[in-house]
């Protein structure tokens, strides 16, 4: 039961996407019913704090491999490191998942304990030295496509504050959200360029075949949890209801920004940065 409760908590910031990025999930949190459900979740798990979500992350890369992988058959049976609900999703895809802390990933790749791994982004991945054990980096994945950080505030302390001071905390979290997201894009892109230019890392976009299979994995995992836990299903249904309306508008209204990028710079996979 405790494990299911923690999985419910994970459900707020990992996946499946339903077309949403982490930015839209934060919109659901604040204006789509997510906040009330999250407070219920914290009470169920036994955490006595108020959580402010901030810094929505770009989708996490699929990660580091010994070669370019393009087909589901390329990764089936592969020993791979990830954590959270993504372990269930990628296991459903046929991968052999190992949950390892960040500091153990690079040594595990070096010794062969795992054959592939993800951690978070080009900056943290390079700090762990992943470029020293792999030269094949796959960007874009649905395994953890909408994560964010959280600022926890003791509930008793928060409730003792005046409404004005509570509002200051909330809006400070919003400010940190935007500022850190802007900084992350600058930092991640600069470190990706360093990986490509100084360490000769090959960078790929994860294939649609693999992405589609990840979504099928999510369907299975979410379906299994929905059957076991009505509250988990309640959270999922709320997200789906929000995504169906909001993303209908957003995805139909957004032009193809990749088309505009390639109009200026050429095929994205061949652009040198």
Regions from the language model: what does each represent?
Residues 24-40:
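Signature of the catalytic double-stranded beta-helix
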Residues 1-5, 9-24, 40-273:
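N-terminal secretory/targeting leader peptides
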